[in-house]
Amino acid sequence: MIDINLIRDPKTREKVVESEKKRFRDGLAVGKAYELDRKRIEMNFRLDQINTRINQLNREIKSGYRQGKNKEDGDLSEKVAEIKGLSDEAKGLRDDVKAVEDELNKVMKGIGNIISPSVVVSNDEKDNPIVRSYRSSRNMQKNPRPFCVLMKDFTHSVAGAKVMGHRGYYLSGKMARLAQALTRYAIDFLENKGYTYIQTPVMLRRDVMRKTSQLSDFDDQLYKVEDDLYLIATSEQSLAALYMDERMVPQEVPKKFCGQSLCFRKEAGAHGKDNAGLFRVHQFEKIEQFVICGPEESQKYHEEMIKACEEFYQSLDISYNVVGIVSGELNDAAAIKYDLEAYFPSAEKYRELVSCSNCTDYQSRELEIRYGVVKENNRKIYVHLLNGTMCAVQRALCCIVENYQTGDGIAIPDVLQGYFGGDLIELGP
């Protein structure tokens, strides 16, 4: 969530409202958060007054005892009665403070990160600006077939639906080997850039998941395993929590991770979209870039991360556009986000393979991942967290299959042939 101090200061509070309006919200949550925070401060001030008075009364009672008085004496009995009344008031106040804090936390989680000035203000993804492009020089197959047709003998979607339900699948044979080759190549690619390979938990406790996900994701995206456990939708969630409740000094950052995990998504908002094939499924594998850095370096690493993605897809010789995501399409945690959209020749469309976000200190504040050893202006400083898909394996596989189809089958990209152990997947008629 954002820094509550931004809401307390009238000047910065207006900036938060402006940022919310860029997300095409009314900004009323900012005013509500301000009122709840002020109410909390007032109640805590009253609690401090009560505690101070109780401590004073206890000292006076002890002094009276030392003078030989007992609690039935008039002045002491009045003091004892006052302590009881104050204690009852304090108990009620503490309950009220807890209720206000819970409501404040809920409201604050609904306020998005401060949007970067460079983000285009729009609520229509058609306005996403193209930042950079790459075009393959390979000769494409005429009348290309869609990936779902090309892969049908390897995905066993009917059997998958029987055992798992909608969007279930098995992946077999050389297509599964190609997926494995793509995974190994993506890991090696990032390790060669100084990233530390890490396999993450695929389940997180509810209290941890709440700190790494939007509230709307709990219903729309996340699978619940037990009352207190959820399956991750991306390894970003488990990587973000790796240093939860810790302090990192400048010498420890940046930390750059290549995360590998299975991912699970309900895709509740995608009913009717991409029903065929592996492009949009409930269970998939993903190789993720994740960077932890100091506040002054996150913009630099954000650019480095998207350029690493570009190098990866250039090495696969896949045509793509990098687009900047408009303000109204940003998730709450992101201050700025790039998508890499790759070309699918059968539809003659560019479709998202990569999302790369700078979340600044939005997630680290809730996770209490602090930065440095001193407070700035008596305020805590937090690390910045960045995430970016390197390879969503099933989606990237669909893209490669379409782009590398030939009259004989599926040609294997040069950089994958050593991992795959060949240069062609033969297809039946």
Curated annotation (Swiss-Prot):
Q: Report the pathway entry.
A: Aminoacyl-tRNA biosynthesis; selenocysteinyl-tRNA(Sec) biosynthesis; L-seryl-tRNA(Sec) from L-serine and tRNA(Sec): step 1/1
Q: Which UniProt keywords apply?
A: Aminoacyl-tRNA synthetase, ATP-binding, Ligase, Nucleotide-binding, Protein biosynthesis
Q: Which InterPro entries match?
A: aa-tRNA-synt_IIb, aa-tRNA-synth_II, aa-tRNA-synth_II/BPL/LPL, Ser-tRNA-ligase_type_1, Ser-tRNA-synth_1_N, SerRS_1_N_sf, SerRS_core, tRNA-bd_arm
Task: Give the residues the record marks as binding L-serine.
Answer: T234, S235, E236, E288, T389
Source organism, top-level taxon: Eukaryota
Q: What's the EC number here?
A: 6.1.1.11
**Which molecular-function annotations from GO does this UniProt entry contain?**
ATP binding; serine-tRNA ligase activity
Q: Which reaction does it catalyse?
A: tRNA(Ser) + L-serine + ATP = L-seryl-tRNA(Ser) + AMP + diphosphate + H(+); tRNA(Sec) + L-serine + ATP = L-seryl-tRNA(Sec) + AMP + diphosphate + H(+)
**Which Pfam families does this entry report, sorted A to Z?**
Seryl_tRNA_N, tRNA-synt_2b
Give the UniProt record's GO annotations in the biological process aspect.
seryl-tRNA aminoacylation
> Does the UniProt entry include the keyword ATP-binding?
yes
Give the binding site residues for ATP: R265, K266, E267, V281, E352, L353, V354, S355
Describe, as the record does, how this protein assembles with itself and its partners: Homodimer. The tRNA molecule probably binds across the dimer.
| Domain comment (free text) | Consists of two distinct domains, a catalytic core and a N-terminal extension that is involved in tRNA binding.
Question: Which family does the entry's similarity section mention?
Answer: Belongs to the class-II aminoacyl-tRNA synthetase family. Type-1 seryl-tRNA synthetase subfamily.
What is the role of this chain?
Catalyzes the attachment of serine to tRNA(Ser). Is also probably able to aminoacylate tRNA(Sec) with serine, to form the misacylated tRNA L-seryl-tRNA(Sec), which will be further converted into selenocysteinyl-tRNA(Sec).
Record-given protein name: Serine--tRNA ligase
From which organism does this entry originate? Encephalitozoon cuniculi (strain GB-M1)
Taxonomic lineage is: Eukaryota, Fungi, Fungi incertae sedis, Microsporidia, Unikaryonidae
